């Protein structure tokens, strides 16, 4: 099996509880991976990393490439290798997509491992969200999203869906289950995905057997009580429910 590492910046629980300061820059992040997802300082948009480029989806759904100097409070990336390929045709919704991916990784005895999946193809519809940066610190992710989150839809779009899977026992380090971000092939639209309808696409699946977590290295990080974020709160901010 290929020995591959997930490089993660901070933890989802820290982000949910309001730690959205810069931990690393985009330039540093891309040294550790070419595919993944995350967000930017102050929760300033949704991050999509694919093919070695880092894109930021703003709260109107438009996308631009992030500069190397842009701050990153939370992200998870890996260096993709040639992994298992899975043909996807006529996927009506995100539940069916997650089910297909679950079956694929279960067949490889991987439900207790991390995975990164890159799906490229034609999407009939993508339901997504993003948000704008909130400058104050110690503001929970739930409150930031309540103030600045916008939802939008993309129809008949060719693009890339980046899917990150963490097993249930890693809850708090990251979101258990599947976390999906999208960017179109023309790099004009994207965001955090709530639902998707796939015409036809190809998924490439990488199993991850190692994690390297870069925690914030400043006194302010130790002022956060990271036991407070409940599973329900994490689910709400990740799934919009």
Regions flagged by a language model, labelled:
Residues 57-58, 127-128, 171-172, 190-192:
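Short helix/loop capping segments that flank catalytic or ligand/cofactor-binding pockets
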Residues 184-227:
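A hydrophobic, small-residue-rich beta->alpha segment in the mid-to-C-terminal subdomain
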Residues 78-89, 209-233, 238:
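Compact, glycine/acidic-enriched structural inserts
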């Amino acid at each position: 099996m290929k020995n591959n590492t997930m490089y993660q910046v901070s933890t989802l629980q820290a982000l949910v509880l309001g730690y959205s300061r810069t931990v690393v820059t985009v330039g540093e992040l891309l040294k550790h991976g070419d595919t993944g997802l995350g967000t930017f300082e102050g929760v300033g948009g949704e991050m999509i990393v694919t093919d070695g480029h880092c894109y930021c989806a703003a709260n109107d759904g438009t996308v631009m490439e992030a500069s190397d100097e842009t701050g990153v409070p939370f992200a998870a990336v890996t260096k993709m290798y040639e992994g298992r390929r899975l043909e996807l045709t006529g996927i009506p919704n995100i539940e069916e997509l997650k089910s297909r991916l679950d079956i694929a990784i279960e067949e490889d005895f991987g439900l207790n491992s991390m995975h990164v999946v890159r799906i490229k193809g034609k999407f009939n519809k993508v339901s997504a969200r993003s948000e704008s940066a909130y400058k104050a610190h110690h503001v929970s992710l739930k409150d930031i999203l309540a103030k600045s989150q916008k939802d939008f839809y993309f129809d008949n779009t060719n693009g890339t869906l980046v899917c990150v899977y963490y097993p249930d026992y890693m809850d708090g380090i990251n979101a258990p289950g599947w976390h999906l971000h999208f960017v179109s092939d023309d790099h004009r639209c994207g965001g955090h995905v709530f639902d998707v309808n796939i015409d036809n696409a190809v998924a490439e699946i990488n199993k991850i057997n190692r994690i390297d977590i870069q925690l914030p290295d400043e006194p302010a990080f130790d002022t956060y009580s990271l036991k407070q974020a409940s599973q329900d709160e994490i689910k709400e901010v990740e799934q919009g429910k």
